[in-house]
Amino acid sequence: EATGSDLVVGDIVSAVDYAKRVAKIQHDAVFLVGTSGGGYHCLVMAGRHPELFAGISAWASISDLRVWYHDNLRSGRRYWSDIVKSCGGKPGDSRAVDEEYRKRSPVHYLRNAKGRVRLQIATGITDGHSGSVPISHSLLAFNEVADSKDRIGLKEIAFMTREARLPDVFERAAPDPSFGDKQPVFHRSSATAAVTIFDGGHEIIPSAAIAWMEGLYAERK
């Protein structure tokens, strides 16, 4: 019932609807933010219900459960067993199991969010080394919502994921005071999405997420 299931999606939709009905909020200024599993569900909602949100901020996010299953087998982290429980088996066990991996993996439908919701994707450069989710998940998620000219090359993604540093051909991102002492290393924007890799690990920088949402809210006034 967890891990990007229809029940989880329905619960989030219901929570937004409840807030709109019982609280005095601006219906066109609802934001979603999360990190790790919360960031993963931010990407799920971006792909499945972009119309509900003015902006979505996803940090240290998983974008492909099949890939993350193998990531965890290699790293020795036991999250792979949770994935198996959620999806009903290991990748390749059956067509039904593989379909569960597909429909619970936002990388397969994030393109639905392009042009429909503002999306901030961010993670620390050492995630996957000191943390549990390789940065390739965030970079490949960005590629799904980016214009073709702005997509990040697969070789560059593999290098950054493996080496936890920028390729020599990339310039370091401009400073951003909202990130404090964990400054951006890489930043790229395209259409209604942006990705930032910062000098950190598997974490959210609350001040940066809040500043991003405040900026979007100011634009809407």
Identify what each model region corresponds to.
Residues 1-2, 37-39, 62-65, 125-129, ...:
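Solvent-exposed loop/turn segments at secondary-structure junctions
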Residues 121-123:
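Short beta-strand/loop motif that positions the catalytic acidic residue
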Residues 187-221:
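Catalytic active-site module of serine/aspartate enzymes centered on a nucleophile-bearing elbow/loop
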Residues 3-23:
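Alpha/beta-hydrolase active-site loop
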Residues 112-119, 189-193:
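Short, proline-enriched alpha-helix->beta-strand connector loops that line the catalytic pocket
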Residues 91, 125-191:
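Active-site-adjacent alpha-helix of alpha/beta-hydrolase-fold enzymes
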Residues 18-22, 26-75:
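Primarily recognizes the serine-hydrolase "nucleophile elbow" in alpha/beta-hydrolase
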Residues 54-55, 61-62, 66-112, 162-179:
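Mobile cap/lid helix-loop segments that gate and shape the active-site cleft of serine hydrolases
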